[in-house]
Amino acid sequence: MHTPDFAGPDDARAVDIMDICESILERKRHDSERSTCSILEQTDMEAVEALVCMSSWGQRSQKGDLLRIRPLTPVSDSGDVTTTVHMDAATPELPKDFHSLSTLCITPPQSPDLVEPSTRTPVSPQVTDSKACTATDVLQSSAVVARALSGGAERGLLGLEPVPSSPCRAKGTSVIRHTGESPAACFPTIQTPDCRLSDSREGEEQLLGHFETLQDTHLTDSLLSTNLVSCQPCLHKSGGLLLTDKGQQAGWPGAVQTCSPKNYENDLPRKTTPLISVSVPAPPVLCQMIPVTGQSSMLPAFLKPPPQLSVGTVRPILAQAAPAPQPVFVGPAVPQGAVMLVLPQGALPPPAPCAANVMAAGNTKLLPLAPAPVFITSSQNCVPQVDFSRRRNYVCSFPGCRKTYFKSSHLKAHLRTHTGEKPFNCSWDGCDKKFARSDELSRHRRTHTGEKKFVCPVCDRRFMRSDHLTKHARRHMTTKKIPGWQAEVGKLNRIASAESPGSPLVSMPASA
């Protein structure tokens, strides 16, 4: 093998650099129209610097020496794989060239640092000691990069629209990659038979529809960045050799990711399964039946509060729905006649025991609606705590009389019957009668005046006292009432007339 003669190396290098710059400017303008990410500017500058360094290194390859350079593959991310090249002579600027080569001589863009070890398949290519082969490979690689960069502006985004998400953690091991795409789209530039991009427009519309659906369901950005990578599912082909557009074999086999937009919607439900909300059912409420002590007929039952569930990794996405009512389970059957109250614990204070004595006169805590005082025996423990709106709280204190009243005025009037006091005197001339109650005095005054203020609404008769009018009204009601035997006869007549129209029975008159 021999080194081919290059006519005008400076002119060829200038032409290559100008082509690269023009393609980069055109791609930037295309990316600004597509509103892609601005992270690609640094990648473009690295690509230009790498090509310039490779061109200058190819011209300096006439000097023979041992140089450790980084291989021209994205597989080497930290200088793990090195290539030994023999040169003729050494130059004084070897350290600077070695530093520039170790930092810049890699195929753009540089592979990310956060990669999975399982996806690496580094194979160190062994290059011969011939100077011609080394220079030819470098120049041909630079030409391939220049053509790929210029063709990136023409092709644009072939498959899918870029998604503004975090960078893809998958390892891209192709030699030449679309730098016009977003970092999340891991597309190799070289077309392989497994990459199904013929109907990319349909996949793009489907993906946009999926993203609108996911925005409606309020998925977080972390879900989009980890589960919705645009190259899902990826088919890995290990150990394959990539072919350039001129039929040359690249000496770095790696794992090639081929994209399939058709399988995206089949893979989406499997990726979004870890965040499915789990509804925890409400625990049932148990009623503990406490044994009844004594002669009480009330069975206390307390509701146990439900146990607090510790919130772990399960976090529902959607809003919580209305909780289902908690079922209440009661243990044994309650005997007939007993009363069971389901109350919160501590709502009712324990009843205080009552003393076994006779209620004194004037006591305000007597049994409700009692016509007379009630004697509590020693067998009864307490008085039932029942609240009534009206109570006979006023009891006559005279010995042997246990009458109770609702009002104090009624009790005072009753006490006058025991004492014989008559504070109300008749003011009529020649009348010295006295009365214990004011209503009795008013009634007596009507006997002097002859006033009859109570009138019957039926027959307009007047009465001096209201009780006389009540008795008279009952008389009117009894005269209008039909006797029982007449009602029965009338009922029989109606039944007979309904059965036979020519019935000889004649209806009796309504009143005799």
UniProtKB/Swiss-Prot annotation:
Pfam families: zf-C2H2. Residues 109-128 are annotated as: Disordered. It comes from the Eukaryota. One of its GO terms (molecular function) is sequence-specific double-stranded DNA binding. One of its GO terms (biological process) is positive regulation of apoptotic process. Induction: By TGFB1. One of its GO terms (cellular component) is nuclear body. Ubiquitous. Higher expression in erythroid cells. Changing T220M: In MODY7; absent in one family member with diabetes; increased repression activity; no alteration in binding affinity to SIN3A. Signal peptide: none annotated. It is found in: Nucleus. SMART domains: ZnF_C2H2. Keywords: Activator, Apoptosis, Diabetes mellitus, Disease variant, DNA-binding, Metal-binding, Nucleus, Phosphoprotein, Repeat, Repressor, Transcription, Transcription regulation, Zinc, Zinc-finger. A zinc finger (C2H2-type) spans 394-418, 424-448, 454-476. Residues 118-128 have a biased composition (Polar residues). The modification Phosphoserine is found at S124. Its main location: nucleus. The keyword Translocase does not apply. CDD domains: KLF11_N (cd21584). Belongs to the Sp1 C2H2-type zinc-finger protein family. It is linked to Maturity-onset diabetes of the young 7: A form of diabetes that is characterized by an autosomal dominant mode of inheritance, onset in childhood or early adulthood (usually before 25 years of age), a primary defect in insulin secretion and frequent insulin-independence at the beginning of the disease. Interacts with SIN3A. Transcription factor. Activates the epsilon- and gamma-globin gene promoters and, to a much lower degree, the beta-globin gene and represses promoters containing SP1-like binding inhibiting cell growth. Represses transcription of SMAD7 which enhances TGF-beta signaling. Induces apoptosis. PANTHER family: KRUEPPEL-LIKE FACTOR 11 (PTHR23235:SF65), KRUEPPEL-LIKE TRANSCRIPTION FACTOR (PTHR23235). This is Krueppel-like factor 11.
